[in-house]
Amino acid sequence: MHDRLISGTEKPEDHFDRAIRPTSLADYIGQPVVREQMEIFIGAARGRGEALDHTLIFGPPGLGKTTLANIIAREMGGNLKSTSGPVLERAGDLAAMLTNLEEGDVLFIDEIHRLSPVIEEILYPAMEDYQLDIMIGEGPAARSIKLDLPPFTLVAATTRAGLLTSPLRDRFGIVQRLEFYSVEDLTHIVTRSANLMNVPMTSTGAAEVARRSRGTPRIANRLLRRVRDYAQVKGTGEVTHDMAQRALDMLNVDKDGLDTLDRRYLSMLLERFDGGPAGVEALAAAMAEDSGTLEDVIEPYLIQQGYVMRTARGRIATNMAYLQFGLTPPEPKN
């Protein structure tokens, strides 16, 4: 897997971001529809003295799903217990977490699409009836007992909502999709992070970092740290527009947030395959990559931004891709 600076997937150094994450909905920047809805749902649940309905949050990596789960727990006044789908391998793992919950607590499960069917079966009665069915003993002497659980809220996050089973998806009372952020919202996020990090920064410097962050706060904060380093060594320490531009150019992140791997993909599609259609396996072979890397790492942003179309016949470069490389788009075929 490529260690890309502009990957939305969390890296070890991103743990630093936890210190600058917002802790309340009032501080939460962007996602106005989600924020307004959650303010209403949380306020109503608190007013009734009830646990918030189970909440599913989905969207691309790096948009703030974990941050929102933390905010929900804090706003509801409960403790947050965190785990992830791949970690919950045995029924006993989940049972231990559920029985340690107190009333009003939030259980956060990241990558919930990777839960095993056995674990899902345990979750169903826990979500619906606040009950835990566990087996005592083995063989013919085995018996099932029910344990009552305190009212709690399950907050689940996934980047692949389509992989969730219908029975699991249907048990969430609240479903929120996080969208890519606007440059304006990302500029506010970068400015806030710079202030918390004591990094002097101009408004145009913040906007330049935001513009190249692919609509993703995690990438914006990562780029901010690298630009800060550059300004500290190559300048006075202040992140100006010029300083941000020079730093990001050095890091091979262009004005549209594309990196070397993105440009190599587009160049291959345009030149080797005449703009397509090209099958993903053929593209992967030409780039000496595996098709999974193309589908999961490279293509999502290029498709979302309109550089590439995915069709039944294969990948096709759009006019925007031609213009990105200074090429003349082909005439439409009749």
UniProtKB/Swiss-Prot annotation:
Pfam families: AAA_lid_4, RuvB_C, RuvB_N. Keywords: ATP-binding, Cytoplasm, DNA damage, DNA recombination, DNA repair, DNA-binding, Hydrolase, Nucleotide-binding. Mg(2+) binds at T66. The lineage of its organism: Bacteria, Pseudomonadati, Pseudomonadota, Gammaproteobacteria, Moraxellales. One of its GO terms (molecular function) is four-way junction helicase activity. Residues 182-252 are annotated as: Small ATPAse domain (RuvB-S). It is an enzyme of class 3 (hydrolase). DNA binds at R310, R315. Has 3 domains, the large (RuvB-L) and small ATPase (RuvB-S) domains and the C-terminal head (RuvB-H) domain. The head domain binds DNA, while the ATPase domains jointly bind ATP, ADP or are empty depending on the state of the subunit in the translocation cycle. During a single DNA translocation step the structure of each domain remains the same, but their relative positions change. Residues 255-334 are annotated as: Head domain (RuvB-H). HAMAP family: DNA_HJ_migration_RuvB. Signal peptide: none annotated. ATP binds at I20, R21, G62, K65, T66, T67, E128, D129, Y130, R171, Y181, R218. It comes from the Bacteria. Residues 1-181 are annotated as: Large ATPase domain (RuvB-L). This is Holliday junction branch migration complex subunit RuvB. Belongs to the RuvB family. GO terms for cellular component: cytoplasm; Holliday junction resolvase complex. Homohexamer. Forms an RuvA(8)-RuvB(12)-Holliday junction (HJ) complex. HJ DNA is sandwiched between 2 RuvA tetramers; dsDNA enters through RuvA and exits via RuvB. An RuvB hexamer assembles on each DNA strand where it exits the tetramer. Each RuvB hexamer is contacted by two RuvA subunits (via domain III) on 2 adjacent RuvB subunits; this complex drives branch migration. In the full resolvosome a probable DNA-RuvA(4)-RuvB(12)-RuvC(2) complex forms which resolves the HJ. It catalyses: ATP + H2O = ADP + phosphate + H(+). The keyword DNA repair applies. InterPro entries: AAA+_ATPase, AAA_lid_4, DNA_helicase_Holl-junc_RuvB, P-loop_NTPase, RuvB-like_N, RuvB_C, WH-like_DNA-bd_sf, WH_DNA-bd_sf. One of its GO terms (biological process) is DNA repair.
